[in-house]
């Protein structure tokens, strides 16, 4: 027997000895590992407990998210365990964060059921976030191989088909959320929908927590909302929609509500992130089968995505939701009232809209990603935005986005229709200025003032909200900053 064979045999024998062996010595750490095209890659931000070696922490994460438990088990010998072990292959210190490390882990594709987000997440985020050896842990990014992505449906409709169905091209789509969230009767709710759509919006929207409460059952809301949609469409000659929230206690109830919305002629239905991954995928499949756009409200995401040291980065949620079948997802505004660093938001939007995503560390994109022809998911900008920010919104977010002005429509002093008209005129004048080649970013406020001379609702809105912004420091910011290239 050669010396090399003897060495491999000895290492393998030691690896399977009974008792507790460090994860790194059990095969979960391999700095020489060669990444395969079919591997799933995950990047964790890990803060080990004092005294825990970062390499051992990374190996523990790899082990506990794949095949390991706390001690050696003899049944490992009955499997292709060397193949099925996840491999931690790289550990880097996080810039400007003491005792915190980026841990790169590769998973063999056979560890995951095809097309099942529930199975994927049960491994990747299943129990390692409660692991005592780490003080804090965050899933920052993932890369999915084309072979796995081909087993996922992707967005039910996609950007191109949605624009064709809505007959809206060359500009962002406009929407608003009905306010107040709760308490309106069905008839009053439908009136809000009608006024907003008649004033120039493309969509009105249920909020995340309006389902089927005693003050307004879902059938009332759906009926009156669709009456408003159809009336506004007839008056304006435009295709209109209202996101009818089908979120419910059971899948049977959700299908019942979605079928009712479809039968009423709705072009779009809505779900909340809190319904869970299996329910989201199920509704994605239903939407594809029924030719209905699927809007996802990210209700609950900030409970685990906002803090930088523990939880999960929202870009991972964006990837999972694009895979699972959602056509829309709220992804930040930059200038609104909700968490949103400009670089991070750009990374979210690129994740949802790119056909191939390149590595971009300032935007938090650690892996290149080929999206395997999955359709694009439309980002939704919602929360504390108004027409006075239109030039900033177009500059930051581009055309493939839904701009949701809730309070910025329904809070207009002259009424909902006037608020909608103000937003539509602001959008149209800014897109026109951009298409004419003007410096609409620098001239934005003046462009809006000029348009307001012939649009009373816009003038009123500009006078009311002026340059209101929500300037708070973001908690989730880039770890790597863009720097100028030096001339040598």
From Swiss-Prot:
Subcellular location: Plastid, Chloroplast
Gene Ontology MF terms in the entry: magnesium ion binding; monooxygenase activity; ribulose-bisphosphate carboxylase activity
Superkingdom of origin: Eukaryota
EC supergroup of this enzyme: lyase
Gene3D superfamilies for this protein: Ribulose bisphosphate carboxylase, large subunit, C-terminal domain, RuBisCO large subunit, N-terminal domain
Note accompanying the cofactor annotation: Binds 1 Mg(2+) ion per subunit.
UniProt KW Oxidoreductase keyword: yes
Gene Ontology biological process terms in this record: reductive pentose-phosphate cycle
Keywords from the UniProt entry: Calvin cycle, Carbon dioxide fixation, Chloroplast, Lyase, Magnesium, Metal-binding, Monooxygenase, Oxidoreductase, Photorespiration, Photosynthesis, Plastid
E.C. number(s) listed in UniProt: 4.1.1.39
UniProt site positions, description: Transition state stabilizer: 337
Binding residues annotated for substrate, in chain numbering: 127, 177, 181, 298, 330, 382
Catalytic residues as annotated in Swiss-Prot or TrEMBL: 179 (proton acceptor), 297 (proton acceptor)
Cited Pfam families: RuBisCO_large, RuBisCO_large_N
Recorded catalytic activity of this chain's protein: 2 (2R)-3-phosphoglycerate + 2 H(+) = D-ribulose 1,5-bisphosphate + CO2 + H2O; D-ribulose 1,5-bisphosphate + O2 = 2-phosphoglycolate + (2R)-3-phosphoglycerate + 2 H(+)
Cofactors: Mg(2+)
Residues annotated with N6-carboxylysine modification: 205
Binding-site positions, Mg(2+): 205, 207-208
SUPFAM superfamilies: RuBisCo, C-terminal domain (SSF51649), RuBisCO, large subunit, small (N-terminal) domain (SSF54966)
GO CC terms: chloroplast
Assembly, per entry: Heterohexadecamer of 8 large chains and 8 small chains.
Function: RuBisCO catalyzes two reactions: the carboxylation of D-ribulose 1,5-bisphosphate, the primary event in carbon dioxide fixation, as well as the oxidative fragmentation of the pentose substrate in the photorespiration process. Both reactions occur simultaneously and in competition at the same active site.
Additional detail: The basic functional RuBisCO is composed of a large chain homodimer in a 'head-to-tail' conformation. In form I RuBisCO this homodimer is arranged in a barrel-like tetramer with the small subunits forming a tetrameric 'cap' on each end of the 'barrel'.
Family in the record: Belongs to the RuBisCO large chain family. Type I subfamily.
Official protein name in the record: Ribulose bisphosphate carboxylase large chain
Top-level taxonomy: Eukaryota, Haptista, Haptophyta, Prymnesiophyceae, Isochrysidales
């Amino acid at each position: 027997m050669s010396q090399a064979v003897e060495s491999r045999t000895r290492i393998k024998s030691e690896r399977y000895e009974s008792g507790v062996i460090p994860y790194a010595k059990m095969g979960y750490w391999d700095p020489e590992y060669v990444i395969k095209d079919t591997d799933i890659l995950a990047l964790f931000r890990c803060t080990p407990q004092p005294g825990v070696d970062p390499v051992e922490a990374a190996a523990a994460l790899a082990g506990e998210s794949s095949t390991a438990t706390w001690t050696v088990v003899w049944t490992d010998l009955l499997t292709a365990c060397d193949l099925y072990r996840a491999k931690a292959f790289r550990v880097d210190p996080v810039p400007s964060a003491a005792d915190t490390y980026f841990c790169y882990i590769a998973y063999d594709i056979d560890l995951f059921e095809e097309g099942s987000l529930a199975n994927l997440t049960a491994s990747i985020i299943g129990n390692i976030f409660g692991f005592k050896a780490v003080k804090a842990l965050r899933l920052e990014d993932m890369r999915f191989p084309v072979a796995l992505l081909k087993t996922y449906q992707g967005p039910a409709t996609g950007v191109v088909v949605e624009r064709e169905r809505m007959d809206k091209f060359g500009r962002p789509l406009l929407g608003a959320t009905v306010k107040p969230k709760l308490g309106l009767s069905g008839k009053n709710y439908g009136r809000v929908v009608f006024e907003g759509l008649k004033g120039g919006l493309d969509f009105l929207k249920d909020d995340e927590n309006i389902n089927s409460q005693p003050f307004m059952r879902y059938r009332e809301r759906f009926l009156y909302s669709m009456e408003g949609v159809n009336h506004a469409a007839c008056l304006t000659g435009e295709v209109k929609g209202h996101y009818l929230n089908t979120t419910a206690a059971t899948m049977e109830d959700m299908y019942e509500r979605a079928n009712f919305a479809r039968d009423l002629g709705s072009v779009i239905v809505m779900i909340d992130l809190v319904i869970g991954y299996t329910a989201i995928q199920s509704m994605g499949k239903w939407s594809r089968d029924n030719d209905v756009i699927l809007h996802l409200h990210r209700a609950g995401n900030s409970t685990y995505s906002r803090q930088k040291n523990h939880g999960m980065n929202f870009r991972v949620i964006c990837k999972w939701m694009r895979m699972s079948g959602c056509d829309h997802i709220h992804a930040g505004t930059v200038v609104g009232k909700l968490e949103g660093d400009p670089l991070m938001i750009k990374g979210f939007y690129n994740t949802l809209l790119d056909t191939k995503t390149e590595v971009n560390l300032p935007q938090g994109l650690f892996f290149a990603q080929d999206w395997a022809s999955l359709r694009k998911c439309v980002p939704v900008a919602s929360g504390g935005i108004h027409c006075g920010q239109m030039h900033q919104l177009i500059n930051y977010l581009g055309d493939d986005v839904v701009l949701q002005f809730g309070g910025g429509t329904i809070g207009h002093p002259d009424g909902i229709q006037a608020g909608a008209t103000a937003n539509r005129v602001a959008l149209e004048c800014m897109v026109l200025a951009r298409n004419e080649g003007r410096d609409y970013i620098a001239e934005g406020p003046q462009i809006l003032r000029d348009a307001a001379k012939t649009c009373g609702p816009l003038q009123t809105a500009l006078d009311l909200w002026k340059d209101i912004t929500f300037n708070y420091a973001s908690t989730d910011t880039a770890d790597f900053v863009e720097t100028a290239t030096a001339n040598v």
